[in-house]
């Protein structure tokens, strides 16, 4: 009887550890980085949110989103091991020693590219960051930019206002993420018309986005890399990106089609 009782107790105690081992929680913040992470009305979506859901179907463990947190708290939770994944950041963005010692990095998932945009007919030669010396560049308040030591910032409160600033010639150029630009033009009809007033130039800066894995779950690095390779190879990743960066074509009303053929 005692042996049976002890066995039951052992199983009950071991069950939470088994559940924990079969689940990886990933960090989510309550600040948007469109179109990579979109936090709106308490709901989370975006390219990287969809990527994590796609990877969940490829792995034997369950990937579970944490409750959205302020960015610094999300990093604290990772450092403490309360979340075990962060998708997706460049290695250079997490150089704090306390973060470095608990971080393992996946293979690159995708690149994030910042491009320079110009008012129409006002492009200037650009080959390196030093070419921005003395220029006025439209930026978003609170964002960091490679090469900012060379140019004078003209801050806007958000990316929509930034596009307007460039279109109206209030700065000589602007710097914006390439996919963010495509997303804004595809999903915001109120600014889509401004595309003709903006000329896209070359890439200014490129970051390699990887999944950060907590060192306590090192055994998951190889399966994670294999899953990333699969969603890249089978087109899943490309389809996710297109979902957020290509305009949705309006579907014609069948009755309208038939009446127009009469």
Residue ranges and their predicted role:
Residues 66-131, 144-145, 202-203:
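Acidic, polar ligand-binding/catalytic clefts
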Residues 62, 143-153, 228-262:
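Ligand-binding clefts/hinges and TM-proximal coupling segments of bilobed small-molecule sensing domains
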Residues 30-32, 110-115, 189-225, 248-262:
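Periplasmic-binding protein-like
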Residues 67, 72-85, 160-183, 187-188:
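Short helices/loops that flank or line small-molecule/ion binding pockets
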Residues 88-99, 173-205:
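A ligand-binding cleft/hinge motif common to bilobed small-molecule-binding domains
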Residues 31-34, 42-55, 118-157, 162, ...:
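Bilobed "Venus flytrap"/periplasmic-binding protein-like clamshell domains
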Residues 21-97, 155:
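Extracytoplasmic small-molecule ligand-binding "clamshell" domains
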Residues 46-58, 120-123, 135-136, 210-244:
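Extended ligand-binding regions for polar small-molecule ligands
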């Amino acid at each position: 009887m005692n042996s049976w009782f002890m066995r039951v107790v052992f199983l009950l105690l071991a069950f939470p550890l088994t559940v924990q081992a079969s689940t990886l929680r990933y960090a989510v913040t309550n600040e948007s980085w469109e179109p990579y992470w979109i936090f709106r009305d308490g709901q989370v979506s975006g390219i990287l949110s969809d990527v994590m859901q796609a990877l969940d179907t490829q792995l034997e463990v369950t990937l579970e989103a944490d409750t959205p947190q302020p960015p610094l708290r999300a990093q604290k939770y990772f450092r403490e091991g309360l979340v075990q994944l962060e998708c997706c950041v460049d290695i250079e963005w997490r150089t704090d020693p306390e973060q470095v010692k608990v971080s393992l990095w996946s293979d690159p998932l995708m690149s994030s590219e910042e491009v320079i945009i110009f008012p129409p007919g006002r492009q200037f030669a650009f080959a390196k960051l030093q070419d921005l010396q003395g220029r006025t560049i439209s930026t978003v308040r609170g964002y960091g930019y490679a090469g900012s030591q060379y140019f004078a910032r003209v801050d806007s409160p958000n990316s929509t206002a930034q596009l307007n600033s460039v279109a109206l010639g209030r700065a000589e150029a602007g710097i914006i993420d390439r996919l963010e630009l495509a997303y804004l033009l595809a999903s915001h009809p109120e600014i889509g018309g401004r595309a003709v007033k903006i000329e896209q130039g070359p890439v200014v800066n490129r970051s390699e986005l990887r999944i950060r894995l907590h060192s306590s779950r090192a055994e998951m690095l190889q399966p994670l890399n294999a899953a990333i390779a699969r969603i890249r190879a089978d087109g899943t990743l490309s389809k996710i990106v297109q979902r957020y960066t290509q305009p949705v074509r309006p579907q014609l009303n069948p009755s309208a089609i038939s009446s127009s053929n009469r």
